[in-house]
A protein has these predicted regions:
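Metal- or metallocofactor-binding catalytic centers and their adjacent structured scaffolds
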Residues: 5, 39-116
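Flexible C-terminal active-site loop/helix
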Residues: 2-4, 9-18, 33, 300-372
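Short Gly/Pro-enriched turn/cap motifs at secondary-structure boundaries
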Residues: 24-29, 97, 353
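N-terminal small/glycine-rich loop or linker at the start of catalytic domains
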Residues: 117, 121-144, 181
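Conserved, mostly hydrophobic/aromatic
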Residues: 3, 36, 43, 72, ...
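Active-site mouth loops of central-metabolism enzymes
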Residues: 133-151, 171, 200, 244
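Catalytic domains of carbohydrate-active enzymes, especially glycoside hydrolases
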Residues: 155-167
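Catalytic core of soluble alpha/beta enzymes
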Residues: 169-172, 176-307, 342
Protein backbone atom coordinates (compact mmCIF):
# COMPACT_ATOMS: atom_id res chain seq x y z
CA UNK A 1 0.00 0.00 0.00
CA UNK A 2 1.25 3.49 -0.87
CA UNK A 3 0.12 7.02 -0.11
CA UNK A 4 -0.70 8.56 -3.48
CA UNK A 5 -2.22 11.86 -2.42
CA UNK A 6 -2.49 14.26 0.51
CA UNK A 7 -5.34 16.76 0.57
CA UNK A 8 -5.34 19.56 3.12
CA UNK A 9 -8.41 21.54 4.17
CA UNK A 10 -9.04 24.34 6.64
CA UNK A 11 -12.32 24.88 8.50
CA UNK A 12 -13.25 27.67 10.91
CA UNK A 13 -14.63 26.30 14.18
CA UNK A 14 -16.71 28.91 16.04
CA UNK A 15 -16.95 28.32 19.77
CA UNK A 16 -20.35 27.74 21.34
CA UNK A 17 -21.28 30.82 23.32
CA UNK A 18 -18.23 32.87 22.36
CA UNK A 19 -14.56 32.90 23.34
CA UNK A 20 -13.34 29.98 25.43
CA UNK A 21 -12.04 31.32 28.71
CA UNK A 22 -8.68 30.51 30.23
CA UNK A 23 -7.13 31.86 33.39
CA UNK A 24 -5.03 34.26 31.32
CA UNK A 25 -8.08 35.67 29.52
CA UNK A 26 -10.32 34.89 26.56
CA UNK A 27 -9.47 33.24 23.26
CA UNK A 28 -10.85 34.19 19.83
CA UNK A 29 -14.48 33.34 19.11
CA UNK A 30 -13.36 30.99 16.33
CA UNK A 31 -10.29 28.87 15.62
CA UNK A 32 -8.83 27.55 12.36
CA UNK A 33 -8.74 23.76 12.09
CA UNK A 34 -6.54 21.89 9.59
CA UNK A 35 -7.89 18.57 8.30
CA UNK A 36 -5.64 16.16 6.40
CA UNK A 37 -6.85 13.45 4.02
CA UNK A 38 -4.38 10.76 2.92
CA UNK A 39 -5.43 8.66 -0.10
CA UNK A 40 -3.85 5.29 -0.87
CA UNK A 41 -3.47 3.19 -4.00
CA UNK A 42 -5.81 0.59 -2.47
CA UNK A 43 -8.72 3.00 -2.22
CA UNK A 44 -8.50 3.55 1.54
CA UNK A 45 -8.42 7.13 2.80
CA UNK A 46 -7.46 8.26 6.27
CA UNK A 47 -8.24 11.53 8.05
CA UNK A 48 -6.72 13.58 10.83
CA UNK A 49 -7.14 17.05 12.30
CA UNK A 50 -5.27 19.64 14.32
CA UNK A 51 -6.68 22.86 15.77
CA UNK A 52 -4.29 25.04 17.81
CA UNK A 53 -5.92 27.68 20.00
CA UNK A 54 -4.34 30.79 18.56
CA UNK A 55 -1.11 32.51 19.51
CA UNK A 56 -2.03 33.20 23.15
CA UNK A 57 -2.23 29.60 24.38
CA UNK A 58 0.57 27.33 23.18
CA UNK A 59 2.84 26.55 20.30
CA UNK A 60 1.38 26.98 16.84
CA UNK A 61 -1.67 28.60 15.33
CA UNK A 62 -4.13 27.68 12.61
CA UNK A 63 -2.46 29.41 9.68
CA UNK A 64 0.90 27.85 10.58
CA UNK A 65 -0.70 24.40 10.74
CA UNK A 66 -1.94 24.44 7.17
CA UNK A 67 1.35 25.79 5.81
CA UNK A 68 3.32 23.18 7.73
CA UNK A 69 0.96 20.43 6.60
CA UNK A 70 1.68 21.30 2.97
CA UNK A 71 5.41 20.88 3.58
CA UNK A 72 5.06 17.65 5.54
CA UNK A 73 2.74 16.11 2.94
CA UNK A 74 5.49 16.32 0.34
CA UNK A 75 7.71 14.16 2.53
CA UNK A 76 5.34 11.20 2.86
CA UNK A 77 3.52 10.86 -0.48
CA UNK A 78 4.78 7.60 -1.96
CA UNK A 79 5.42 6.01 1.44
CA UNK A 80 3.70 2.96 2.95
CA UNK A 81 1.04 4.23 5.42
CA UNK A 82 1.10 1.00 7.41
CA UNK A 83 4.67 1.67 8.59
CA UNK A 84 3.52 4.23 11.14
CA UNK A 85 6.50 4.28 13.49
CA UNK A 86 8.93 4.48 10.57
CA UNK A 87 7.06 7.48 9.14
CA UNK A 88 7.07 9.16 12.54
CA UNK A 89 10.84 8.85 12.66
CA UNK A 90 11.14 10.04 9.08
CA UNK A 91 9.26 13.27 9.68
CA UNK A 92 10.94 13.84 13.03
CA UNK A 93 14.24 13.93 11.11
CA UNK A 94 13.03 15.93 8.11
CA UNK A 95 10.61 18.24 9.95
CA UNK A 96 12.12 19.41 13.23
CA UNK A 97 9.90 20.65 16.07
CA UNK A 98 6.32 21.84 15.34
CA UNK A 99 4.89 18.62 16.77
CA UNK A 100 1.31 19.80 16.29
CA UNK A 101 1.75 19.83 12.48
CA UNK A 102 2.51 16.09 12.56
CA UNK A 103 -0.53 15.09 14.61
CA UNK A 104 -3.18 15.03 11.82
CA UNK A 105 -0.91 12.95 9.57
CA UNK A 106 -0.31 10.44 12.34
CA UNK A 107 -4.06 10.17 13.03
CA UNK A 108 -4.70 9.63 9.32
CA UNK A 109 -2.19 6.76 9.29
CA UNK A 110 -3.96 5.08 12.22
CA UNK A 111 -7.29 5.63 10.47
CA UNK A 112 -5.95 3.87 7.37
CA UNK A 113 -4.51 1.02 9.45
CA UNK A 114 -7.80 0.52 11.26
CA UNK A 115 -9.81 0.49 8.04
CA UNK A 116 -7.36 -1.95 6.43
CA UNK A 117 -7.62 -4.27 9.45
CA UNK A 118 -11.38 -3.83 9.84
CA UNK A 119 -10.84 -2.72 13.44
CA UNK A 120 -11.45 0.46 15.43
CA UNK A 121 -8.29 2.41 16.16
CA UNK A 122 -8.49 1.73 19.91
CA UNK A 123 -7.93 -1.98 19.22
CA UNK A 124 -4.68 -1.14 17.43
CA UNK A 125 -3.58 1.19 20.24
CA UNK A 126 -3.74 -1.63 22.76
CA UNK A 127 -7.38 -2.70 23.05
CA UNK A 128 -10.61 -1.32 24.46
CA UNK A 129 -10.70 -1.35 28.25
CA UNK A 130 -13.83 -1.86 30.30
CA UNK A 131 -15.80 0.71 32.25
CA UNK A 132 -17.42 4.02 31.40
CA UNK A 133 -15.18 7.03 30.84
CA UNK A 134 -16.36 10.16 32.69
CA UNK A 135 -15.94 13.38 30.75
CA UNK A 136 -14.70 16.48 32.50
CA UNK A 137 -16.67 19.62 31.67
CA UNK A 138 -14.93 22.94 31.48
CA UNK A 139 -17.16 25.39 33.31
CA UNK A 140 -17.91 28.39 31.11
CA UNK A 141 -18.43 31.94 32.35
CA UNK A 142 -18.60 34.08 29.23
CA UNK A 143 -18.93 37.51 30.86
CA UNK A 144 -16.56 39.09 33.34
CA UNK A 145 -19.42 40.26 35.57
CA UNK A 146 -20.41 36.59 36.04
CA UNK A 147 -17.06 35.85 37.68
CA UNK A 148 -18.28 35.25 41.21
CA UNK A 149 -17.94 32.13 43.38
CA UNK A 150 -21.71 31.70 43.35
CA UNK A 151 -21.80 31.79 39.54
CA UNK A 152 -19.16 29.09 39.28
CA UNK A 153 -21.08 26.88 41.69
CA UNK A 154 -24.35 27.41 39.79
CA UNK A 155 -22.71 26.51 36.48
CA UNK A 156 -21.38 23.28 37.98
CA UNK A 157 -24.91 22.45 39.08
CA UNK A 158 -26.16 23.17 35.56
CA UNK A 159 -23.64 20.71 34.12
CA UNK A 160 -24.50 18.20 36.83
CA UNK A 161 -28.07 18.25 35.48
CA UNK A 162 -26.61 17.20 32.09
CA UNK A 163 -24.92 14.19 33.70
CA UNK A 164 -21.42 15.55 34.31
CA UNK A 165 -19.59 14.66 37.51
CA UNK A 166 -16.14 16.12 36.76
CA UNK A 167 -15.92 19.93 36.70
CA UNK A 168 -12.94 21.94 35.51
CA UNK A 169 -12.80 25.49 36.84
CA UNK A 170 -10.58 28.31 35.64
CA UNK A 171 -8.62 30.49 38.01
CA UNK A 172 -10.12 33.85 38.96
CA UNK A 173 -8.47 37.27 38.67
CA UNK A 174 -6.81 37.14 42.10
CA UNK A 175 -5.57 34.49 44.48
CA UNK A 176 -8.27 35.33 47.04
CA UNK A 177 -11.01 35.15 44.41
CA UNK A 178 -9.69 31.80 43.20
CA UNK A 179 -9.74 30.40 46.73
CA UNK A 180 -13.31 31.65 47.20
CA UNK A 181 -14.38 30.04 43.90
CA UNK A 182 -12.84 26.71 44.84
CA UNK A 183 -14.51 26.84 48.26
CA UNK A 184 -17.92 27.57 46.70
CA UNK A 185 -17.66 24.71 44.22
CA UNK A 186 -16.33 22.20 46.76
CA UNK A 187 -19.27 23.08 49.03
CA UNK A 188 -21.77 21.81 46.44
CA UNK A 189 -19.92 18.66 45.34
CA UNK A 190 -21.92 15.46 45.70
CA UNK A 191 -20.40 12.04 46.44
CA UNK A 192 -18.54 10.75 43.39
CA UNK A 193 -18.03 14.21 41.90
CA UNK A 194 -14.64 15.73 41.17
CA UNK A 195 -13.41 19.30 40.81
CA UNK A 196 -10.25 20.60 39.18
CA UNK A 197 -8.94 24.15 39.08
CA UNK A 198 -6.96 24.78 35.90
CA UNK A 199 -4.66 27.78 35.92
CA UNK A 200 -3.36 27.12 32.38
CA UNK A 201 0.03 28.16 33.74
CA UNK A 202 -1.35 31.61 34.50
CA UNK A 203 -0.58 31.94 38.21
CA UNK A 204 2.54 33.64 39.46
CA UNK A 205 4.53 31.44 41.81
CA UNK A 206 3.62 33.50 44.92
CA UNK A 207 -0.09 33.41 44.02
CA UNK A 208 0.08 29.67 43.37
CA UNK A 209 1.58 29.10 46.82
CA UNK A 210 -1.10 31.28 48.44
CA UNK A 211 -3.85 29.38 46.66
CA UNK A 212 -2.37 26.02 47.65
CA UNK A 213 -2.30 27.11 51.30
CA UNK A 214 -5.90 28.32 51.10
CA UNK A 215 -7.35 25.12 49.60
CA UNK A 216 -5.14 22.44 51.17
CA UNK A 217 -8.08 20.91 53.05
CA UNK A 218 -10.47 20.96 50.08
CA UNK A 219 -11.08 18.11 47.58
CA UNK A 220 -9.64 19.94 44.57
CA UNK A 221 -7.07 18.90 41.96
CA UNK A 222 -4.74 21.73 40.94
CA UNK A 223 -3.99 21.76 37.21
CA UNK A 224 -0.97 23.44 35.61
CA UNK A 225 -0.46 26.11 38.27
CA UNK A 226 2.53 27.94 36.73
CA UNK A 227 4.05 28.52 33.32
CA UNK A 228 7.38 26.70 33.63
CA UNK A 229 8.40 23.23 34.69
CA UNK A 230 10.78 24.72 37.27
CA UNK A 231 7.95 26.59 38.98
CA UNK A 232 5.69 23.53 38.93
CA UNK A 233 8.40 21.39 40.52
CA UNK A 234 8.88 23.91 43.33
CA UNK A 235 5.11 24.33 43.70
CA UNK A 236 4.72 20.61 44.31
CA UNK A 237 6.84 20.97 47.45
CA UNK A 238 4.32 23.48 48.84
CA UNK A 239 1.04 21.85 47.77
CA UNK A 240 -0.83 19.05 49.54
CA UNK A 241 -3.48 18.66 46.85
CA UNK A 242 -3.15 16.33 43.86
CA UNK A 243 -1.49 18.05 40.90
CA UNK A 244 -2.20 17.54 37.23
CA UNK A 245 0.31 18.88 34.70
CA UNK A 246 -0.70 19.83 31.17
CA UNK A 247 0.94 22.62 29.19
CA UNK A 248 4.51 21.76 30.25
CA UNK A 249 4.18 18.15 29.06
CA UNK A 250 5.20 18.08 25.39
CA UNK A 251 7.66 15.19 25.16
CA UNK A 252 8.59 11.93 26.82
CA UNK A 253 11.52 13.78 28.38
CA UNK A 254 9.13 16.30 29.97
CA UNK A 255 7.05 13.48 31.41
CA UNK A 256 10.09 11.75 32.90
CA UNK A 257 11.47 14.98 34.29
CA UNK A 258 8.18 15.79 36.02
CA UNK A 259 7.92 12.26 37.41
CA UNK A 260 11.51 12.20 38.64
CA UNK A 261 10.86 15.49 40.46
CA UNK A 262 7.61 14.20 41.96
CA UNK A 263 5.83 17.16 40.36
CA UNK A 264 2.58 15.51 39.31
CA UNK A 265 -0.02 12.92 40.21
CA UNK A 266 -1.86 13.13 36.88
CA UNK A 267 -0.45 13.74 33.41
CA UNK A 268 -2.48 15.32 30.63
CA UNK A 269 -1.45 13.96 27.25
CA UNK A 270 -2.76 16.25 24.53
CA UNK A 271 -2.44 14.39 21.24
CA UNK A 272 -1.63 17.38 19.04
CA UNK A 273 0.78 18.91 21.56
CA UNK A 274 2.90 15.75 21.76
CA UNK A 275 2.89 15.10 18.01
CA UNK A 276 0.15 12.54 17.37
CA UNK A 277 -1.38 9.30 18.57
CA UNK A 278 1.86 7.34 18.21
CA UNK A 279 3.81 9.53 20.62
CA UNK A 280 0.76 9.93 22.87
CA UNK A 281 0.44 6.16 23.18
CA UNK A 282 4.12 5.86 24.12
CA UNK A 283 3.76 8.51 26.81
CA UNK A 284 0.54 6.96 28.09
CA UNK A 285 2.22 3.57 28.43
CA UNK A 286 5.07 5.16 30.39
CA UNK A 287 2.51 6.76 32.72
CA UNK A 288 0.94 3.36 33.29
CA UNK A 289 4.32 1.76 34.00
CA UNK A 290 5.17 4.55 36.46
CA UNK A 291 1.75 4.46 38.13
CA UNK A 292 0.76 8.00 37.10
CA UNK A 293 -2.86 8.84 36.32
CA UNK A 294 -3.30 9.67 32.62
CA UNK A 295 -5.73 12.11 31.04
CA UNK A 296 -6.16 11.52 27.29
CA UNK A 297 -6.92 14.92 25.79
CA UNK A 298 -6.35 17.36 22.95
CA UNK A 299 -6.23 21.09 22.46
CA UNK A 300 -9.30 21.79 20.29
CA UNK A 301 -11.08 20.46 17.24
CA UNK A 302 -14.13 18.84 15.71
CA UNK A 303 -15.13 15.23 15.01
CA UNK A 304 -11.73 14.09 13.67
CA UNK A 305 -9.79 15.27 16.73
CA UNK A 306 -12.52 14.04 19.08
CA UNK A 307 -12.66 10.56 17.54
CA UNK A 308 -8.88 10.14 17.79
CA UNK A 309 -9.09 11.32 21.40
CA UNK A 310 -11.90 8.88 22.19
CA UNK A 311 -10.01 5.90 20.79
CA UNK A 312 -6.92 6.96 22.74
CA UNK A 313 -9.00 7.18 25.91
CA UNK A 314 -10.69 3.81 25.40
CA UNK A 315 -7.29 2.14 24.92
CA UNK A 316 -6.02 3.52 28.25
CA UNK A 317 -6.22 1.04 31.17
CA UNK A 318 -9.17 1.85 33.41
CA UNK A 319 -7.13 2.03 36.62
CA UNK A 320 -4.95 4.84 35.25
CA UNK A 321 -7.62 6.78 33.32
CA UNK A 322 -8.89 9.81 35.23
CA UNK A 323 -11.28 11.21 32.62
CA UNK A 324 -11.43 12.53 29.06
CA UNK A 325 -13.46 15.05 27.08
CA UNK A 326 -15.60 15.48 23.96
CA UNK A 327 -14.39 18.57 22.13
CA UNK A 328 -17.34 18.57 19.72
CA UNK A 329 -19.41 19.89 22.61
CA UNK A 330 -17.50 23.19 22.50
CA UNK A 331 -17.78 24.04 18.77
CA UNK A 332 -20.70 24.74 16.44
CA UNK A 333 -19.49 23.10 13.20
CA UNK A 334 -19.85 19.39 12.36
CA UNK A 335 -17.12 18.19 9.98
CA UNK A 336 -17.95 14.46 9.77
CA UNK A 337 -20.69 11.89 10.32
CA UNK A 338 -20.32 8.72 12.37
CA UNK A 339 -18.88 10.20 15.54
CA UNK A 340 -20.24 8.68 18.76
CA UNK A 341 -20.96 11.73 20.89
CA UNK A 342 -20.72 11.62 24.64
CA UNK A 343 -23.96 11.39 26.59
CA UNK A 344 -24.93 12.01 30.21
CA UNK A 345 -21.39 12.95 31.14
CA UNK A 346 -19.73 9.86 29.66
CA UNK A 347 -17.61 9.42 26.54
CA UNK A 348 -19.15 7.70 23.52
CA UNK A 349 -17.73 4.73 21.59
CA UNK A 350 -17.88 3.54 17.99
CA UNK A 351 -16.64 0.12 16.87
CA UNK A 352 -16.53 1.15 13.19
CA UNK A 353 -13.17 0.51 11.48
CA UNK A 354 -10.52 3.20 11.82
CA UNK A 355 -11.77 6.44 13.32
CA UNK A 356 -15.25 5.57 12.07
CA UNK A 357 -15.93 8.87 10.31
CA UNK A 358 -17.32 10.00 6.97
CA UNK A 359 -16.25 13.57 6.18
CA UNK A 360 -18.82 16.18 5.27
CA UNK A 361 -17.17 17.38 2.09
CA UNK A 362 -19.52 20.35 1.83
CA UNK A 363 -18.14 21.55 5.17
CA UNK A 364 -14.50 20.83 4.33
CA UNK A 365 -14.94 22.79 1.10
CA UNK A 366 -12.23 23.48 -1.44
CA UNK A 367 -8.79 22.11 -0.51
CA UNK A 368 -6.06 24.52 0.46
CA UNK A 369 -3.42 22.15 -0.92
CA UNK A 370 -3.30 18.92 -2.91
CA UNK A 371 0.00 17.04 -2.97
CA UNK A 372 0.42 14.08 -5.34
Amino acid sequence: MKIIRAIIYTVDLPTKGGGYRRTSGFSPDSNVSTIVQLDTDEGISGYGEVCPLGTHYGRGWGEASVSGANLLAKMIVGEDPMQIEKLNRLWDVKFKEDLYVKAPFDAALWDIAGKAAGRPVCHLLGGRYEGDIPMYRTVHLFKQHEDTPESWARRCQDYRAEGYQHFQLKGAATADATIATIEAVCDILAPGELALCDANGGWSFPDAVRIAAGVRNLPIIIEQPCRTMEECIEFRKRCWNPIKLDEVIETTQDLLRAWNAGAMDYCTIKISRVGGLSKARRMRDICVDLGIGAVPDDTWGSEFVSSALAHFAWSTPTKYRLNATDLTDYVTVVTADGYARGENGYLGFSDAPGLGLTPRMNVLGKPDYVVE
